[in-house]
Amino acid sequence: GMSGIASTTYPSTDEAMLGAEAAYAGMEAELQDYLDTYESTHSYDEYHFDLDEIGHDPYVLISILTAYHQGEWTLDEVQGTLDMLFEKQYILTERVVVETRYDSEGDPYSWYICYVTLENTDLSHLPVYIMGEEQFSMYAVYMATLGNRPDLFPQSQYPNASQKEGYLDYDVP
């Protein structure tokens, strides 16, 4: 079988892993932009936003992809998985309520109120729902070792990235 160190190390190329992280971060940036420009691109009378923060830990992403695909993968191979994860992580709800209001003459008019909600189910909460037992234990091992690649996502560039020592006393919310 695999030697201990090999089975705890991410098997995919840096190009694939950095590419998957960039693709996922790109989807998040698009969502952020959609929300940031919401009022200027929609024409309702009133807006109410209830938005979770957008973001993820790149080590969680790569550990999920590696465990889910049970080994090495290319960016092409995980494109569908990235979409699936994104749809599970972010639930965007847009609801419009129309109220009848009356002007100073007492004439009725419609007032459109838009409620926008973004729910972020942290990426680290998804493995238990999408993986079998074997995949899940692979995921846990990769997270414990950070795939033996603490250099892959430096905190300076990836503020949400796990750090090796910090992981061990990480509390599950």
Tell where the protein language model's regions lie, with residue ranges.
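Membrane-proximal envelope biogenesis segments
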Residues: 1-172
